[in-house]
Design a protein with these regions (language model features):
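Glycine-rich phosphate/pyrophosphate-handling loop used in enzymes and phosphotransfer proteins
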Residues: 1-218
Length: 218
């Protein structure tokens, strides 16, 4: 009873005095609030990409910014569980018809220069939160088999999807170890799908059997 009253009080307080910083917004999120975030729309003509939440929602945007620029992983405790459930649901049909199927979990990589600049890769943090829920060890974490070998301009600075696709050509490199395996790519946000499409094409060229992608937002 007391806990319910506290939740009601916090809800009223947030309405009267809404949080003004991304940190304050993220700090107030719990499992229930994260589960109730607005769902993302499908990525047009890319049904292999599975985004969770609608990016323009202020809470979703706060999660992304806190993770990407401040390494705030608090929401991943809950988001990792959601991702894992979605992934297992997706691959269950594959396992039914192919018991020998191998599934690689690969975060979208960044270049070494970008890693030095930022200190971490937020996509790796998301992937690791998924692994923490993979108690049956269904997924093999394999970031070493997929690298970004060329820096590319930030998408927001590109004028068109065609230009973005052109900038991305040849920026990834896949290890032959992906041959014959199913790959699940992890990223924070999908906008046009250009980065994920180039990643997928590179993995297919290296022999991946199929490639899916999951993102927090779209």
């Amino acid at each position: 009873m007391l806990q319910n009253l506290q939740k009601i009080f916090i809800t009223i307080l947030d309405y009267v005095l809404p949080p003004r910083t991304d940190f304050a917004i993220v700090e107030k999120l719990d499992a229930e609030k994260i589960n109730n975030l607005p769902k993302a729309q499908d990525v047009e003509k890319m049904d292999w990409i599975h985004p969770l939440f609608y990016y323009k929602d202020n809470k979703v945007r706060a999660i992304i910014w806190e993770l990407k620029y401040k390494e705030n992983t608090w929401p991943l405790e809950h988001i990792g569980k959601i991702f894992h459930e979605e992934i297992i649901a997706l691959i269950s049909d594959i396992v039914t018809f192919n018991n020998d199927a191998e599934f690689l979990l690969i975060p979208i990589p960044i270049t070494n220069d970008r890693r030095i600049e930022r200190g971490y890769n937020q996509s790796e943090l998301i992937a690791k939160s998924i692994l923490e829920n993979d108690l049956a060890r269904t997924l093999l974490y394999a970031p070493q088999w997929f690298q970004k070998i060329k820096e590319t301009p930030k998408q927001s600075r590109s004028e068109s999807r065609q230009e973005r696709m052109s900038n991305l050509i040849g920026c990834f490199e896949a290890d032959p170890g992906v041959d014959g395996k199913y790959v699940i790519l992890i990223d924070d946000v999908v906008t046009t799908g250009s980065t994920l499409s180039e990643a997928r094409a590179t993995l297919f060229s290296a022999g991946a059997r199929d490639v899916f992608a999951f993102t927090i937002a779209h």
